[in-house]
C-alpha cells in the first residue's frame, strides 16, 4: 500500500457534493465480509540518476522536466498526473494477474503485492547482487533462484453461496516486463512514483511495528520512538526519504556508521564511505531546529576519528529532539489501488496536493478493503489503515480522534495485526472488511515540529511528532525527559552539551498549557476553501501516545 509540501495551498475543484464526500463518516458501521472458515541520499544533481538513487526532494520535484522552478499549480498538476499514472499501472498489473473483480482490486493486500513487485523490479542494484549470488550458489551446488523474476502473494475472491472470502495465490512476473510497463505508463523513469510508494510502506511500518530492537542496538532509549519515523526507508528513496525521516533515524544511521569506523579504522579513509558519513551528518544538521542542536552536530562533523564521545553526543542530540522537534515532512500516501479508482470516483480536479485538501477528500471517497488476520477487529484495523495513510504513528491520538469523530486507541489496546499476511497465515477462506474510519474534519499537513511546549505524558513513547497543523498542546512526558537529562557533560565539548541541556531544561520549565501551531484551525471536510475554521476539541480521556506501551510486533521479527 501505499504512502509533498505546499502547506495551505488548496486550489482546484472536486466534482463531488459535500454530502458525497462525507458519505462515509467515521461513526457509521460498515459491513464485514465474513469468511466461511477464518483461518544516504545524494545532494549532488546527476544527469541520469539511477533507480537506486532517485533524487527528487519534495512535491516540487515530481515530474520535473527542467531546472525551472514550478508554480504551485504546475506542481499540483504534475502530482495529479503521477498518482493517476500509478493507478493506471496498477490496473494493468491486475489484468496481467487475471484479477478483475472490483473487490479484488480494492484489496489493500493486492495493492501492496503490486507495489512490492514494482520496487523489486526497479531495484537494479539488488538484481545485480542476486545475479552474483546465484553465480556463487551454482558453484557451491546450491539451488539457483531466477534473478530475472519477481513475484508476490495476491488474493482471489471466491463466492460460496452468500459468502465472499479470499484465497491466496502466488504470481510471478518478469522484472523487465514490469519495468517496461511502468516506464511506458509513467512516460518517464517514474522515480517520484517509486519514492511515493516507498514512503507509503515506511509509514505503514511505523504504525504496524515497534522498533525497540533497532533503537536498543544503537544505544538509544525505546522511548525515543517518536523520533524514529522512516526507519525502514531504503536508501534509494533519496532526498525525498530524508525529508520524512525523523531525527532519531538519522542519529541511528550515524551511530551505526561510527560503530563500523571504530571496528575498521580504515573505513573513513575510503572516499565513498567518508562522503556517505558526511552526508548523513549534514542531513542531520539540516533537520535540527535549534542552534544548540546544530552546534552539537558540528562537533561530531569536526571529529577526525569518530568514537564513543561522538556516539554520546549523538545520543544526547536524539534525546533533545523529543523536546525541540526537528523538521519532518508529512504526506498523505494512499494505496495505488485507490489511485486506480480516481476516474470512477469523479475526482476530476487535475490538481492534487499530498499535504492538503485533495488527498484527504480522495481518502474519504475511497472504499478500501483489507484481509482480516486471525483475531483481527475490523474497526481497529481501520485505525491502523488511517494512521498508515497519514503517517500519523507518532501524532497525538486526541487530534486524530477530533478529526475523525472516532476514539483512537493506543497500539496495546488494538485487537489487530499488520497488513502483511505471513506465509504461515495464508489459508483458504480468509475474511475481509471495509476500512470504515473517515475524516469529518481536515487540516493541512505540517513539516515543522510545532514548538517546544510540553504537556503530560506516558511511560513508553514520551512525546508526539505532529502531522496535522492544528493548534493544540504538544504531549510530552516531562518526567521521562528529566530522567534523560541527568548525564555527564564533561569532556571536549562540555560547553556545547551544557548549552543543549540548558535549552532542554528551559523548555521543560515552561508552562504546560502552552499550545503549538497557534491560530491553526480544522475545517469540515466539505469546506474545501477553508471558509469556516473550527476550534479542535481535545478530549482528555483519550491517551496521547499510540506507542504508550509497546506491544506491537517488532519489525525486525517480521517474517516475509
Curated annotation (Swiss-Prot):
Pfam families: Flu_NP (PF00506). InterPro entries: Flu_NP. Late in virus-infected cells, may be cleaved from a 56-kDa protein to a 53-kDa protein by a cellular caspase. This cleavage might be a marker for the onset of apoptosis in infected cells or have a specific function in virus host interaction. It is found in: Virion; Host nucleus. Residues 1-73 are annotated as: Disordered. Keywords: Capsid protein, Helical capsid protein, Host nucleus, Host-virus interaction, Ribonucleoprotein, RNA-binding, Viral nucleoprotein, Viral penetration into host nucleus, Virion, Virus entry into host cell. GO terms for cellular component: helical viral capsid; host cell; host cell nucleus; ribonucleoprotein complex; viral nucleocapsid. GO terms for molecular function: RNA binding; structural molecule activity. One of its GO terms (biological process) is viral penetration into host nucleus. It comes from the Viruses. Its main location: virion. Encapsidates the negative strand viral RNA, protecting it from nucleases. The encapsidated genomic RNA is termed the ribonucleoprotein (RNP) and serves as template for transcription and replication. The RNP needs to be localized in the host nucleus to start an infectious cycle, but is too large to diffuse through the nuclear pore complex. NP comprises at least 2 nuclear localization signals that are responsible for the active RNP import into the nucleus through cellular importin alpha/beta pathway. HAMAP family: INFV_NCAP (MF_04070). Homomultimerizes to form the nucleocapsid. May bind host exportin-1/XPO1. Binds to viral genomic RNA. Protein-RNA contacts are mediated by a combination of electrostatic interactions between positively charged residues and the phosphate backbone and planar interactions between aromatic side chains and bases. Belongs to the influenza viruses nucleoprotein family. This is Nucleoprotein. It comes from Influenza B virus (strain B/Singapore/222/1979). The gene is NP.
